[in-house]
Amino acid sequence: MTPPKLPVREGRDALTPRPVSVQRGVNPHAPGSAHLKMGRTEILATVTLDDKPAPHMRGKKEGWLTAEYSMLPRSTTDRQARERNLQNGRRHEIQRLLGRALRSSMDLRPFKNQTLYVDCDVLVADGGTRVASVLAGHAALHDFCDRLINSGQLSEWPIVHNVGAISVGLIGDELRVDLDYEEDKVARADLNVIATDTGLLVEVQGGAELGPITVDEYTRLLSCGVASVQDVMRELTPQLAVIQGI
């Protein structure tokens, strides 16, 4: 039997992530915002500060951060119905992932009795929307915290880790970093790796798609993912110093 034709990458090798760019301060109504591009995938992230504590955080010494995720109807090749079901399984799973990832980066004690909402909306989807949302959410939080510091509303920088994310997968027997949509469709295993820019692991999500893989293959995916997050953050972090919107 002839093996299936694997997607060919244009302009990058198997271990090179797609170019990442970000613009801060793109929403004049939000106290923190960012528009992030990762290849053809685009995410708009905004931060809102609510003066109400999350129910489970009442009386605690720190605030809470929660995330929401949504895809525009024409973010994909074919129009999909606008999301109205708050119990959508995939959406709920991604929102929990985003919340955990972004909370790991923040000292929330300055936000006692308050709740931070990070909204991530997919404008264009070409694979990796959840990892791009982690990056966009982190950029929007950076924008938010920078504005609070500059306005005197905060005295100490509350972001304790620069957190990023990347997808890694096995396409045939080849390990590839930052899968686009065509690669994601045929991957026999893929992981979403969330880590800090110093190489500390935050979360791993994913597994085998087309049958079991070996422990060695999983370990290689994980190690490559953590290293690739550091590569992406080296490209992204300097851009966070520039406010290009408001």
Swiss-Prot record:
EC number: 2.7.7.56
InterPro entries assigned to the protein according to its UniProt record, in alphabetical order: ExoRNase_PH_dom1, ExoRNase_PH_dom2, ExoRNase_PH_dom2_sf, PNPase/RNase_PH_dom_sf, Ribosomal_Su5_D2-typ_SF, RNase_PH, RNase_PH_bac-type, RNase_PH_CS
Function in brief: Phosphorolytic 3'-5' exoribonuclease that plays an important role in tRNA 3'-end maturation. Removes nucleotide residues following the 3'-CCA terminus of tRNAs; can also add nucleotides to the ends of RNA molecules by using nucleoside diphosphates as substrates, but this may not be physiologically important. Probably plays a role in initiation of 16S rRNA degradation (leading to ribosome degradation) during starvation.
Assembly description: Homohexameric ring arranged as a trimer of dimers.
Keyword Glycoprotein: no
A Gene Ontology molecular function term of the record: RNA binding
Family stated for the protein in its record: Belongs to the RNase PH family.
Protein name: Ribonuclease PH
UniProt entry keywords in alphabetical sequence: Nucleotidyltransferase, RNA-binding, rRNA processing, Transferase, tRNA processing, tRNA-binding
GO biological process: rRNA catabolic process; rRNA processing; tRNA processing
Pfam (any one): RNase_PH_C
Gene3D superfamilies, A to Z: GHMP Kinase, N-terminal domain
Superkingdom of this protein's organism: Bacteria
